[in-house]
Protein backbone atom coordinates (compact mmCIF):
# COMPACT_ATOMS: atom_id res chain seq x y z
CA UNK A 1 0.00 0.00 0.00
CA UNK A 2 2.80 2.46 0.92
CA UNK A 3 4.61 1.67 -2.36
CA UNK A 4 1.43 2.27 -4.38
CA UNK A 5 0.93 5.66 -2.74
CA UNK A 6 4.53 6.62 -3.37
CA UNK A 7 4.28 5.58 -7.03
CA UNK A 8 1.13 7.68 -7.48
CA UNK A 9 2.73 10.87 -6.07
CA UNK A 10 2.97 13.78 -8.47
CA UNK A 11 6.19 15.64 -9.02
CA UNK A 12 6.82 19.16 -10.23
CA UNK A 13 8.97 19.58 -13.31
CA UNK A 14 9.91 21.90 -16.12
CA UNK A 15 10.69 21.39 -19.80
CA UNK A 16 13.45 23.66 -21.03
CA UNK A 17 16.21 22.88 -23.52
CA UNK A 18 19.80 23.44 -22.42
CA UNK A 19 20.18 25.77 -25.40
CA UNK A 20 17.72 28.19 -23.74
CA UNK A 21 19.96 28.82 -20.72
CA UNK A 22 21.71 32.20 -20.53
CA UNK A 23 25.13 32.13 -22.13
CA UNK A 24 28.01 34.29 -23.26
CA UNK A 25 28.72 32.00 -26.22
CA UNK A 26 25.51 32.13 -28.23
CA UNK A 27 23.90 28.93 -26.91
CA UNK A 28 23.10 27.61 -23.44
CA UNK A 29 25.76 25.22 -22.17
CA UNK A 30 26.30 22.64 -19.46
CA UNK A 31 28.27 25.14 -17.40
CA UNK A 32 27.79 27.59 -14.53
CA UNK A 33 24.33 28.73 -15.61
CA UNK A 34 23.14 25.11 -15.80
CA UNK A 35 24.37 24.48 -12.25
CA UNK A 36 22.69 27.68 -11.04
CA UNK A 37 19.46 26.69 -12.78
CA UNK A 38 19.44 23.24 -11.19
CA UNK A 39 20.09 24.81 -7.79
CA UNK A 40 17.17 27.24 -8.31
CA UNK A 41 14.93 24.32 -9.26
CA UNK A 42 15.97 22.45 -6.12
CA UNK A 43 15.37 25.50 -3.90
CA UNK A 44 11.85 25.81 -5.33
CA UNK A 45 10.95 22.15 -4.91
CA UNK A 46 11.12 21.35 -8.63
CA UNK A 47 12.48 17.83 -8.94
CA UNK A 48 12.46 17.22 -12.70
CA UNK A 49 14.22 19.11 -15.49
CA UNK A 50 13.22 17.64 -18.83
CA UNK A 51 15.54 18.66 -21.64
CA UNK A 52 15.67 18.09 -25.37
CA UNK A 53 18.15 15.50 -26.65
CA UNK A 54 21.80 16.55 -26.39
CA UNK A 55 23.09 14.34 -29.20
CA UNK A 56 24.98 15.70 -32.24
CA UNK A 57 22.32 17.10 -34.55
CA UNK A 58 21.93 16.33 -38.23
CA UNK A 59 20.08 18.18 -40.94
CA UNK A 60 18.26 21.31 -39.80
CA UNK A 61 19.82 21.25 -36.31
CA UNK A 62 16.95 19.07 -35.11
CA UNK A 63 17.62 17.30 -31.81
CA UNK A 64 15.42 14.48 -33.08
CA UNK A 65 17.71 13.65 -36.03
CA UNK A 66 21.01 12.92 -34.26
CA UNK A 67 24.11 11.40 -35.80
CA UNK A 68 24.59 9.25 -32.71
CA UNK A 69 22.54 8.04 -29.78
CA UNK A 70 25.67 7.80 -27.61
CA UNK A 71 27.65 10.97 -28.37
CA UNK A 72 26.88 14.41 -27.00
CA UNK A 73 26.83 17.55 -29.13
CA UNK A 74 29.99 19.54 -28.49
CA UNK A 75 28.04 22.79 -28.80
CA UNK A 76 26.87 22.34 -25.19
CA UNK A 77 30.40 22.07 -23.76
CA UNK A 78 31.15 25.05 -21.55
CA UNK A 79 34.28 26.90 -22.65
CA UNK A 80 34.45 28.48 -19.19
CA UNK A 81 34.60 25.05 -17.53
CA UNK A 82 37.29 23.95 -20.00
CA UNK A 83 39.32 27.02 -19.01
CA UNK A 84 38.78 26.32 -15.30
CA UNK A 85 39.91 22.71 -15.86
CA UNK A 86 43.16 23.97 -17.40
CA UNK A 87 42.34 22.68 -20.89
CA UNK A 88 42.37 26.19 -22.43
CA UNK A 89 45.26 28.66 -22.05
CA UNK A 90 42.99 31.69 -22.13
CA UNK A 91 39.34 32.27 -21.38
CA UNK A 92 37.25 32.51 -24.55
CA UNK A 93 35.79 35.94 -25.30
CA UNK A 94 32.08 36.67 -25.16
CA UNK A 95 30.22 35.77 -28.35
CA UNK A 96 26.54 36.61 -28.90
CA UNK A 97 25.73 36.88 -25.19
CA UNK A 98 22.14 36.03 -24.19
CA UNK A 99 20.65 36.19 -27.68
CA UNK A 100 17.01 35.23 -28.25
CA UNK A 101 17.74 32.74 -31.05
CA UNK A 102 20.66 30.40 -31.63
CA UNK A 103 22.78 30.68 -34.77
CA UNK A 104 24.10 27.12 -34.55
CA UNK A 105 26.55 27.46 -37.44
CA UNK A 106 28.06 30.68 -36.04
CA UNK A 107 28.35 29.17 -32.55
CA UNK A 108 30.04 26.04 -33.92
CA UNK A 109 32.49 28.17 -35.91
CA UNK A 110 33.24 30.29 -32.83
CA UNK A 111 33.73 27.33 -30.49
CA UNK A 112 35.68 25.04 -32.82
CA UNK A 113 39.22 26.40 -32.22
CA UNK A 114 38.70 26.39 -28.45
CA UNK A 115 37.32 22.85 -28.49
CA UNK A 116 40.27 21.71 -30.62
CA UNK A 117 42.72 23.27 -28.16
CA UNK A 118 40.96 21.64 -25.21
CA UNK A 119 40.88 18.31 -27.05
CA UNK A 120 44.61 18.41 -27.76
CA UNK A 121 45.27 18.99 -24.05
CA UNK A 122 42.71 16.38 -22.97
CA UNK A 123 44.24 13.60 -25.10
CA UNK A 124 47.15 13.37 -22.66
CA UNK A 125 44.93 12.38 -19.73
CA UNK A 126 43.84 9.04 -18.33
CA UNK A 127 40.22 10.23 -18.60
CA UNK A 128 40.69 10.46 -22.37
CA UNK A 129 42.18 6.97 -22.60
CA UNK A 130 39.29 5.60 -20.54
CA UNK A 131 36.75 7.43 -22.73
CA UNK A 132 38.22 6.05 -25.96
CA UNK A 133 37.91 2.49 -24.66
CA UNK A 134 34.13 2.74 -24.95
CA UNK A 135 33.10 0.57 -27.91
CA UNK A 136 31.11 3.21 -29.82
CA UNK A 137 33.77 5.97 -29.77
CA UNK A 138 36.05 4.70 -32.55
CA UNK A 139 33.19 3.95 -34.94
CA UNK A 140 31.61 7.33 -34.29
CA UNK A 141 34.94 9.14 -34.82
CA UNK A 142 35.42 7.37 -38.16
CA UNK A 143 31.85 8.20 -39.19
CA UNK A 144 32.27 11.91 -38.36
CA UNK A 145 35.66 12.08 -40.10
CA UNK A 146 34.21 10.55 -43.27
CA UNK A 147 31.17 12.82 -43.09
CA UNK A 148 33.38 15.89 -42.80
CA UNK A 149 35.67 14.83 -45.67
Residue ranges and their predicted role:
Residues 3-149:
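Acidic/aromatic-lined carbohydrate-recognition and catalytic surfaces
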